[in-house]
């Protein structure tokens, strides 16, 4: 009897479950009848939802009390459809106004229609940034922004990137634009101390931005576009909105994992002559570093026949014709000073003979590099709120041995609309960036082989062509490049061996950065909104440079450290009026106040004379020299932006900003930036858009900034 009662109970509850919900199916299309793939279908007021398939169809189990389905798709107007008795619900979505008139985030986070702008603006999406696999988000968009030149300082991982927006120049050579991330200024400095670290290639701090977390990138190219940022925007502005900082909301839950790998190889090397061997005055000299000696034996007859010269093949007493004493143990090279290091290259008390011929010195020195990146993006929400989280890791091994950069980024952000007209948003990002590189910068064509820049390329590119840097001795053992007992360099008397440099000398940087913001918006009336936004951007950068004892330029060795702290706090308070006067005139006025504080501090220590091999810190040096620098700046600003539009084709805008700086004399701390711009859309005004002329606009601007 108990078994029958249990079976009856199960049947009863199953029947209740079937009655409590039903399955809705349908198709989502655009106005032309084309299916919309991946459109969101959500039960209004809940988190129950799904997305359409490749045919635009969907199937969704809904509760019995569900009353409305909400359909949405990127670039289209959302649509609410009441649920009746039918279990088939189709929806047709209309193209959104934002597609017809693109809206961009411009100065101070202001959103503006692109056709209303009286200045040049370029906008890039996340797909534009991720299309090219690059560790640096700025290099990822090189060549994609008209009028903007983006160049790297070198091919090494983590090296700096220079940006120049057309029309901006500086007597000091600083043409870097202002970076703004999620409405907060973002320091993009190259933290290099002049004279303290020669031969190193530093990163811009824009390297700390994770490309996987970029929702959009907007470049404000004119002074009129950037005037609301004041003097910092003299060279233009790059506005970045992150995925965790964007205000868009996605219905339901989406998890995206991306993984990419890019192989890197040296793109090319200079053309080298392979006609003349080491020496000078066209005479072979095993103790001379230059390539101005006798011709290689294979070229003697050709040169004499072609130019009527009287060259003869090199003959070194005691050696067969066409051979010379092994360079590593003759002349000014280390074998003549450290013969015990090269016993296998000696025979009967003298250097073994080797053919006098050119070798490929440069190519084998480099290695294949690689960029490996993984990212996880979690995005979820409903019609009133959303949450986004991005976690990523990047590793970049450079083409120069022992060169590396890496970045770990964790970002969380979200936004919510409350019932009383309030909305709140915020995001925070933590980034750890590391860089390690041998001294691959510095002067390549300096001419002084013993100079203190310590650059690998200074040493590498001017070696005699008949020297086999990457060779092996007769017993199959690679040529030694350091003394096995002391670890000192063994090479030419005025040169560090490039292989010794990449093993021992290095520059490294470890950056920890936190940035984010919180914003509160209150819609007082349909035409008046108040906004308060606060953000902070802070990082520490610990740098170390090691020059091991035993080199030519630094015989005693040197350790240099630099501890940098940088913090910026930025507060903005805005009032926005957005209304119409009749059917033809649109009016928008923004008035705001900005408070900004920047603190910067650095303490560097130079230790000379390394005491113990392998122990590389400033405390383990004979003498230390230290210095410290600190700076605190505070700025206040009042600003305004007014725009008047007529029939959606004629726009006039006025901007003004007044700054007050703590770093200027008390009697002259105020400076003013006015501006005016206009836009006239010809194709809309005269209704002349056609297949030949789809869009035409006149624009102009005048602004005082700098």
Whereabouts are the PLM-identified features?
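Short, well-ordered amphipathic alpha-helices
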Residues: 181, 200, 239-242, 412, ...
């Amino acid at each position: 009897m108990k078994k029958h009662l249990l079976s009856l109970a199960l049947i009863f509850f199953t029947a209740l479950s079937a009655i409590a919900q039903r399955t809705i199916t349908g198709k989502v299309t655009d106005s032309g009848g084309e299916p919309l793939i991946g459109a969101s279908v959500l039960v209004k007021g809940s988190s129950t939802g799904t997305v359409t398939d490749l045919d635009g169809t969907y199937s969704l189990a809904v509760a019995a009390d569900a009353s409305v389905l909400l359909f949405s798709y990127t670039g289209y107007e959302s649509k609410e459809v009441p649920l009746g008795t039918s279990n088939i619900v189709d929806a047709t979505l209309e193209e959104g106004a934002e597609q017809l008139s693109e809206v961009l985030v411009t100065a101070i986070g202001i959103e503006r229609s692109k056709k209303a702008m009286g200045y040049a603006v370029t906008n890039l999406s996340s797909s534009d940034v991720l299309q090219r696999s690059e560790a640096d988000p700025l290099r990822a968009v090189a060549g994609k922004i008209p009028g903007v030149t983006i160049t790297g300082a070198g091919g090494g991982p983590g090296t700096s990137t220079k940006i120049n927006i057309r029309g901006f120049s500086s007597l000091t050579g600083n043409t870097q634009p202002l970076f703004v991330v999620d409405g907060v200024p973002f320091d993009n400095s190259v933290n290099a101390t002049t004279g303290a670290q020669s031969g190193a290639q530093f990163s811009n701090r824009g390297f700390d931005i994770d490309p996987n977390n970029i929702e959009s990138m907007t470049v404000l190219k004119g002074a009129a576009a950037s005037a609301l940022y004041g003097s910092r925007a003299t060279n233009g502005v790059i506005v970045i909105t992150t995925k965790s900082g964007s205000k868009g909301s996605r219905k339901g839950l989406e998890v995206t994992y991306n993984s990419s790998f890019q192989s890197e190889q040296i793109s090319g090397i200079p053309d080298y002559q392979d006609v003349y061997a080491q020496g000078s005055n066209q005479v072979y000299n095993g103790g001379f570093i230059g390539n101005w000696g006798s011709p290689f034996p294979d070229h003697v007859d050709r040169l004499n026949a072609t130019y009527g010269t009287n060259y003869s093949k090199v003959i070194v007493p005691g050696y067969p014709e066409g051979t010379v004493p092994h360079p590593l143990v003759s002349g000014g090279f280390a074998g003549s000073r450290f013969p015990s290091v090269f016993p296998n290259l000696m025979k009967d008390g003298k250097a073994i003979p080797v053919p006098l011929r050119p070798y490929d010195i440069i190519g084998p020195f480099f290695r294949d590099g690689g960029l490996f990146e993984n990212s996880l993006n979690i995005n979820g929400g409903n019609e009133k709120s959303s949450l986004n989280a991005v976690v990523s890791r990047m590793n970049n091994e450079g083409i120069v041995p022992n060169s590396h950069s890496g970045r770990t980024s964790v970002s969380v952000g979200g936004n919510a609309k409350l019932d009383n007209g309030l909305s709140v948003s915020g995001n925070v990002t933590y980034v750890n960036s590391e860089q390690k590189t041998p001294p691959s910068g510095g002067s390549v064509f300096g001419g002084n082989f013993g100079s203190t820049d310590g650059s690998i390329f200074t040493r590498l590119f001017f070696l005699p062509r008949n020297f086999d840097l990457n060779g092996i001795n007769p017993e199959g053992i690679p040529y030694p490049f350091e003394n096995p007992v002391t670890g000192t360099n063994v090479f030419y008397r005025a040169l560090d061996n490039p292989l010794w440099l990449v093993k021992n000398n290095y520059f490294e940087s470890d950056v920890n950065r936190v940035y984010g913001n919180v914003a509160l918006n209150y819609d007082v009336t349909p035409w008046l909104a108040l906004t308060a936004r606060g953000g902070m951007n802070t990082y520490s950068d610990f740098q170390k440079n090691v020059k091991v004892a035993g080199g030519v330029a630094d015989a005693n060795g040197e350790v240099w450290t630099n501890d940098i702290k940088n913090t910026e706090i930025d507060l903005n308070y805005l009032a926005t009026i957005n209304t119409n006067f009749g059917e033809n005139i649109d009016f928008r006025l923004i008035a705001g106040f900005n408070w900004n504080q920047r603190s910067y501090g650095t303490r560097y220590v130079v230790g000379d004379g390394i005491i113990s091999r392998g122990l590389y810190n400033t405390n383990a040096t004979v003498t230390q020299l230290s210095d410290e620098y600190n700076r605190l700046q505070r700025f206040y600003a009042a600003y305004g932006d007014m725009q008047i539009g007529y029939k959606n084709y004629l726009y006039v805008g006025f901007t003004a900003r007044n700054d007050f700086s703590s770093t200027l004399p008390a009697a002259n701390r105020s400076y003013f930036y006015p501006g005016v711009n206009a836009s006239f859309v010809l194709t809309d005004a005269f209704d002349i858009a056609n297949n030949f002329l789809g869009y035409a606009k006149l624009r102009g601007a005048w602004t005082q900034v700098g």
